[in-house]
Amino acid sequence: MSKSKRIILSVVIILAVGIGLFFFLREVFSGRLIVRDYIFQIGKFQLRWYSICIASGILVAYVLARRRLSMYPIKPEDLDEGLFWGIVAGILGARIYYVIFNWNYYSKYPSEIYKIWHGGLAIHGGIFGALLMIFIYSKIKGYFKFVHATDLFTSVLPLAQAIGRWGNFFNYEAYGRPTTLPWKMYVPPERRMPGFDIDRFFHPTFLYESLWDITIFVFLYFFVEKRKREYGETTALYLILYSLGRFWIESLRLDSLMAGHFRAAQVVSIILIFIGAAWYAYIIGKTGKRDN
């Protein structure tokens, strides 16, 4: 099949999926259709949509990363091994982060700390865990740099996040405050946050973040990666762009983890914006001096 035909086919598939998704969401958001959080159940075992969304996001990101390996001095077998350890570190980081900001509860029920199947993972913790593992792994391997791996990682991470966020959709969680906007999302009574029992429709913040993540992915993967002049640009821009979107979206959510009187995700987002901006400014300054 020629390149032009592949592009046309891809556009047709994307349009078909988009149209189908629009009508599906219209039914769910109106409350005429209630989704369940699992695909099937055998005894006490449930195959949950949340797990499928997370796994699908990782798989798609991995496939796209493999396609870009020619741009990086990283061996395919080391990408595979690094992915495994990155997933382990990401899960641990996501859980540790969540437990820290819910310590009042977990200090009373320490046996719940390891029971991640009861819920409780935070994306910022997952990112920090994965980045720490990338740093350690790059030092162990020695032949590629930390920024080589982080650029490859952050070029596909937004798409994995965009897909993973749909797990929140099936769980009716991570939604925002009540709203009357046309795209408001119906939440069943049993899934509503305490104090919002009489409210029926809420901001679909999972969708906001998913769309924002897709936008970041398209920008980084198809534009920045092909035009960057220095390793580290993709990583710095990811930190800035994701954090800007997350800061705003977090202001709408009802289930934010708190750091004292502040939303933890917003505090972390501000820090990451400054780190990303300083990093990007350093890279631009470095390339500018080199050109001169």
Curated annotation (Swiss-Prot):
One of its GO terms (biological process) is lipoprotein biosynthetic process. Pfam families: LGT. Its main location: membrane. It is an enzyme of class 2 (transferase). It comes from the Bacteria. Keywords: Cell inner membrane, Cell membrane, Membrane, Transferase, Transmembrane, Transmembrane helix. The chain crosses the membrane at residues 7-27, 45-65, 83-103, 116-136, 204-224, 264-284. Its EC number is 2.5.1.145. GO terms for cellular component: plasma membrane. InterPro entries: Lgt. Signal peptide: none annotated. A 1,2-diacyl-sn-glycero-3-phospho-(1'-sn-glycerol) binds at R165. The keyword Transferase applies. GO terms for molecular function: phosphatidylglycerol-prolipoprotein diacylglyceryl transferase activity. It is a multi-pass membrane protein. It is found in: Cell inner membrane. Catalyzes the transfer of the diacylglyceryl group from phosphatidylglycerol to the sulfhydryl group of the N-terminal cysteine of a prolipoprotein, the first step in the formation of mature lipoproteins. Belongs to the Lgt family. This is Phosphatidylglycerol--prolipoprotein diacylglyceryl transferase. The gene is lgt.
